[in-house]
């Protein structure tokens, strides 16, 4: 099992925003988190590599296990978690003062101890795969939103994660670039990596999901295979899909 979440509860201050979350994903699954704004999708995905720290529950992901009531007690374990579980943010978070290739090689050299030559070789292979090799020496400022998003995906893949998390990867991208990101997610499926994707775009979800998690108000309302799109089991999900 690549991901197992058990009885996860999350609070912002005194306000509870995730309630008793339970979910599992097999290796190679592409799990899509759907739901209206405020459902808790982005909070949930950020708990999967402890960017947000739950109050209670259990998390097992990419062979890292945490009792969430004291998850921050072991900084080394968290560092390992973040090597094994990559994250692609909605806002890209590229370092503006570094070129594309420098953005890619920074973490592998500092965190994994990879040599500069090896890191650059890996980076150029990834950039070719994502059709970005001609941008290697450009700065993020000179890239389009779609190019920045693909560079952000490449940067996350440089750490060779077992699980990759995407928070709204196609938000604010035009249809052509959205299609490119969908193609990348499909290509990654063939490598066996496990992916978790937050999106509000049902058509994107339908193209990539092997597993669907529908949320409202911090709770999982429906969970199942991609068949859920054709045969939703709950009125809430049926209503969501009809809009």
From Swiss-Prot:
Q: Does the keyword Ubl conjugation apply?
A: no
Metal-binding listed as a keyword: no
| Broad class of the protein's primary localization | membrane
Q: Which InterPro entries match?
A: AAA+_ATPase, ABC_ATPase_HisP-typ, ABC_transporter-like_ATP-bd, ABC_transporter-like_CS, MetN_ABC_transporter-like, P-loop_NTPase
Leading EC class = translocase
Keywords linked to the UniProt accession? Amino-acid transport, ATP-binding, Cell inner membrane, Cell membrane, Membrane, Nucleotide-binding, Translocase, Transport
Task: Show the catalytic activity.
Answer: a polar amino acid(out) + ATP + H2O = a polar amino acid(in) + ADP + phosphate + H(+); L-arginine(out) + ATP + H2O = L-arginine(in) + ADP + phosphate + H(+)
Domain ABC transporter residues, every copy: 3-242
Matching NCBIfam families, A to Z?
Answer: PRK11124.1
State its role.
Part of the ABC transporter complex ArtPIQM involved in arginine transport. Probably responsible for energy coupling to the transport system.
Q: What is this protein called?
A: Arginine transport ATP-binding protein ArtP
Q: Which gene encodes it?
A: artP
């Amino acid at each position: 099992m690549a991901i197992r979440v058990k009885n996860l509860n999350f609070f912002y201050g005194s306000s509870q925003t995730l309630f008793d979350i339970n979910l599992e994903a097999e290796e190679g699954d592409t799990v899509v988190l759907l739901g209206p704004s405020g459902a808790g999708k982005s909070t949930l995905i950020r708990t999967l590599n402890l960017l947000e720290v739950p109050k209670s529950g259990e998390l097992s992901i990419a062979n890292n296990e945490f009792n969430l009531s004291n998850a921050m007690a072991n900084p080394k374990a968290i560092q390992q978690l973040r090597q094994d579980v990559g994250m692609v943010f909605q806002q890209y978070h590229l370092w503006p003062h570094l070129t594309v290739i420098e953005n890619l090689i920074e973490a592998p050299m500092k965190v994994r101890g990879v040599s500069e030559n090896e890191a650059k070789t890996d980076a150029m292979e990834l950039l070719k795969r994502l059709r970005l090799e001609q941008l290697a020496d450009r700065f993020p400022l000179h890239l389009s939103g779609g190019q920045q998003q693909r560079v952000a995906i490449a940067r996350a893949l440089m750490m060779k994660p077992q699980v990759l998390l995407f928070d709204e990867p196609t938000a604010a991208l035009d249809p052509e670039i959205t299609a490119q990101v969908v193609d990348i997610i499909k290509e990654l499926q063939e490598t066996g990596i496990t992916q978790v994707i937050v999106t509000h775009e049902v058509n994107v979800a339908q193209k990539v999901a092997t597993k669907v998690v529908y949320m409202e108000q911090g709770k999982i309302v429906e969970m199942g295979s991609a068949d859920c799109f054709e045969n939703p089991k709950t009125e809430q999900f049926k209503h969501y899909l009809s809009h």
